[in-house]
Amino acid sequence: MEFQKDLIKLNQHFPDKEAAIRFCGQLLADGGYVEPAYIDAMIQRDKELSVYMGNFIAIPHGTDDAKKDVLKSGITVVQVPDGVNFGTEDDPQVATVLFGIAGIGDEHLQIIQNISIFCADVDNVVKLADAQTEDEVVKLLSQVN
């Protein structure tokens, strides 16, 4: 799957994880990738099982029931330099890069796996978090496919 520059947002700030997840979902909805109902399913998914993946990465995506709201596969990349906490005050899980995902069928599972492998190397995450342009992000993530 190709990364679209209009779905890459740099230097974002969020008060909490729900705002961050909603932002990712709204990008997908605005781009015609999902119905607006998918956004709430992304929030629900995180409540059921955290979308925080470790290494400063979160991968918000919808519940299985929300697959009906996916119009086409898409992925957002949202850089949050100050981070957003996906954990608790006592057990913070801070993400500096978010990948909002909508996939037709089981396509999102492969996308999540590829991103997880790429981001297992924290140096790759640091490069994404430090990227200055959308083109730089696209170039870094060209290794994911």
From Swiss-Prot:
Top-level taxonomic group: Bacteria
Active site positions, chain numbering: H61
A GO biological process held by the record: phosphoenolpyruvate-dependent sugar phosphotransferase system
Sites of Phosphohistidine modification: H61
Organism: Streptococcus mutans serotype c (strain ATCC 700610 / UA159)
Entry's free-text remark on domains: The PTS EIIA type-2 domain is phosphorylated by phospho-HPr on a histidyl residue. Then, it transfers the phosphoryl group to the PTS EIIB type-2 domain.
Protein name: Mannitol-specific phosphotransferase enzyme IIA component
Listed GO MF terms: kinase activity; protein-phosphocysteine-sugar phosphotransferase activity
One GO CC term on file: plasma membrane
Role: The phosphoenolpyruvate-dependent sugar phosphotransferase system (sugar PTS), a major carbohydrate active transport system, catalyzes the phosphorylation of incoming sugar substrates concomitantly with their translocation across the cell membrane. The enzyme II CmtAB PTS system is involved in D-mannitol transport.
Entry-linked Pfam families: PTS_EIIA_2 (PF00359)
Gene: mtlF
InterPro entries: PTrfase/Anion_transptr, PTS_EIIA_type-2_dom, Sugar_PTS
Primary site of residence: cytoplasm
Keywords in alphabetical order: Cytoplasm, Kinase, Phosphoprotein, Phosphotransferase system, Sugar transport, Transferase, Transport
Domain PTS EIIA type-2 span(s) in chain numbering: 1-144
Location(s) in or outside the cell: Cytoplasm
